[in-house]
């Protein structure tokens, strides 16, 4: 049987439970992106992977376990990856105050970026799937205001990206 191309909430939950059973030391993960939305039940569509924002120990030290879980659960080998880590500067310094903890999976502790922080990352990304996810979760006025409040900070580092985000928000709010 070939591995599934997409992860559902149930397959992701099962894989995290398996990872928790297989690890013999404390592990802490913060997930973002669509995986965070799926696990918090804000999004229904499957995702390609779980975006690891931070991990303790470092994600590289967990690769053998992650691959073993992929094989056991018939998941893509990169079902958990740190590709989002290149963009963590987009998150405000206090994002950890808003993390949402999942129930423990044995020694594995998993927290999710808050919905507003995921929305910020999606507006920053603006890939077609990010826009589709935003349409699916229908950000509230206060969530969009939060994103708007981050534009000057992001603009100090990436002015063109902040301008694109501003234009997207204006178009979004215009309907």
Language-model regions, residue ranges each:
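Compositionally biased terminal segments of proteins
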Residues: 1-175
